Amino acid sequence: MNIVEVRHPLVQHKIGLLRDASLSTKGFRELVTELGTLLAYEATANLETESHTQPGWAGPVNVQRIAGAKITLVPILRAGLGMLPGVLALIPTARVSVVGLQRDEETLQPVPYFERLTGRLEERDALILDPMLATGGTLIATIDMLKRAGARRIKGIFLVAAPEGLKALEAVHPDVEVYTAAIDDHLNDKGYILPGLGDAGDRIFGTRVE
């Protein structure tokens, strides 16, 4: 499985700022947006292009354009929505597919409660957006959903990832590429990433308990 930990100095600087527990909701949200743009830039570096001839100021000119159907972004509710503006700033023509999952309290497995996917997934690159890759359960369920709908080229973009989640993903979907700003140490007994970011959804939307 292709796992890319983006070591660009700007990415590392910004993920360090995100780890500050005293950071305001506004500051956290802005950094998530910025990191979404930077990580999406890395994740789209190997998109296929095709030649196209268009009018230029001095006559016809041959240029490169992204081949195939437009990319679809797949934010996982709710925290994934925080990354969406930054990625759309880079890829404004992208389609957006939205997925929501919640944990079944008896089986502890993720269960979809919302699914709105764009069409022609078999022709598109799908970029899953989620700040945290922890156990991998939600991500794996999302990939299962996308593949059932026809998606064949899937990448995941995360701010931080846990080794346990990466291992779980590789066991069932080794074809999926992962891009992250940081691979953290481990999960604690409650499934939180350490050192992590805390609850990214609460910090993005300002719903954490003060």
From Swiss-Prot:
Pathway: Pyrimidine metabolism; UMP biosynthesis via salvage pathway; UMP from uracil: step 1/1
UniProt xrefs under InterPro entries: PRibTrfase_dom, PRTase-like, Upp_B, UPRTase/APRTase, Ura_phspho_trans
Note accompanying the cofactor annotation: Binds 1 Mg(2+) ion per subunit. The magnesium is bound as Mg-PRPP.
Co-factor(s): Mg(2+)
Annotated binding of 5-phospho-alpha-D-ribose 1-diphosphate, by residue: 78, 103, 130-138, 199
Keyword Glycosyltransferase: yes
UniProt entry keywords in alphabetical sequence: Allosteric enzyme, Glycosyltransferase, GTP-binding, Magnesium, Nucleotide-binding, Transferase
Molecular function terms from GO: GTP binding; magnesium ion binding; uracil phosphoribosyltransferase activity
Binding site for uracil: 193, 198-200
Cited function: Catalyzes the conversion of uracil and 5-phospho-alpha-D-ribose 1-diphosphate (PRPP) to UMP and diphosphate.
Protein name in the entry: Uracil phosphoribosyltransferase
Protein source organism: Xanthomonas oryzae pv. oryzae (strain MAFF 311018)
